[in-house]
Each structure stands twice: as structure tokens, then as C-alpha cells.
Amino acid sequence: MNDTATVGGKGASLGEMFQKLSGIGVKVPNGFTLTTAAFKQFVEAEIPETTWNNIGAPEDIEELRNAAINCSTLASALEVCLRDADPKDHLNLNSRASLARSLVRETPVPDEIKLVIAQEYSKLCELYHPGVDVAVRSSATTEDSADASFAGQYESYLNVSGEQDIIEKWRRCVASMFTCLLYTSPSPRDGRISRMPSSA
């Protein structure tokens, strides 16, 4: 069964190796992956008004920030950040990417996703030991596609311990997808938000 479309390449490969190799004595660390459905739930969540109190914007995109404030969901605000971006204007792209990353980092993670992370991390603690360290990495479905490769351009976090830290690092993994704006031409998916699962 190919799960790449829902958990990305890294997540699918880790699951396959654990299932096939653990039984024959090859040590493969267990883990879990938040799916594209979790990513969708996060970006479709409403943005609390107070979120914007911690988000500034460079002068060259102040109007863009004001337009994004009127959006009800994270996804729609992010699409405003990306829309009509000029891939040749690197300074403007950098400002847009910075605004998008700040927005993701400040938007609360839905309670349902927090619960899933807590439950899955608890299973790893039972399997290994309490407070076990994990790596939080992107497993994006678009990292290595037929027309683009973003491998190594998203953030990875090592030695992460505790459910709260995992939640924060997952959110930062999501935010890091907007660092790749500078490497894409034209703007990523023409302003549409791609799917990013993440693995721990």
C-alpha cells in the first residue's frame, strides 16, 4: 500500500521499513506521522484576532498584511501572502515569506491535533522510555515530485522531547515550507497551499 499521498515520502518509507525489517532483526526506530488531513485541519482553522498582535510586516507589504487580517482562516491568509508574487523580486518574496512564516508560528494548533500528538508520543514513551527524544521532520508530498524538488529545504528538529515541544516543532516545520518561496518560480503552486505531513 502506497501511503505517500497522505504521509509523504519520508513517513511512508519509515513505516514500510519498520513493518518489513523489524521482524527480521533490523533495528528501525518507530515513529508517527501527522497526515495531510492534519495539515489541512490546521490551515483551515480560524485565526484568532489576537494572533495579529504579534505579527508585524515590513513596510513594502503592509497593505498585504492588512488584506490578510480580513481573512478568516490561516489558508486564506497565506494565499493572500503568496498571491501575485513576482518571482524575480527577491526582496518582496522574502518579506512575503517572512509574513507567512510568522503567521503560521503564531496561529494556535487545533486541540484535536494536539491530542493526536500527545497520544502517539505517549506510545513511543511506552515503547522506549519516558521523555524519549524524537526528530521532527517534514514529509511533504511535494518534496520530490516530477516537476520540483524541495528535499532538505524544510526544517528538521532533533532531540525533541515532550509533547508540547513536538507540537511547537511541528508548527515550525509547517512554517518552514514558506522559506522555499525563494527557490521557486513562479510562486509556489500559484498561491495555493500544498500539503505537508510531518513525522516524529
What are the residue ranges of the model-derived segments?
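Positively charged, low-complexity/disordered segments
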Residues: 187-190, 194-200
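N-terminal beta-alpha lobe that positions the nucleotide/phosphoryl donor
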Residues: 1-185, 189
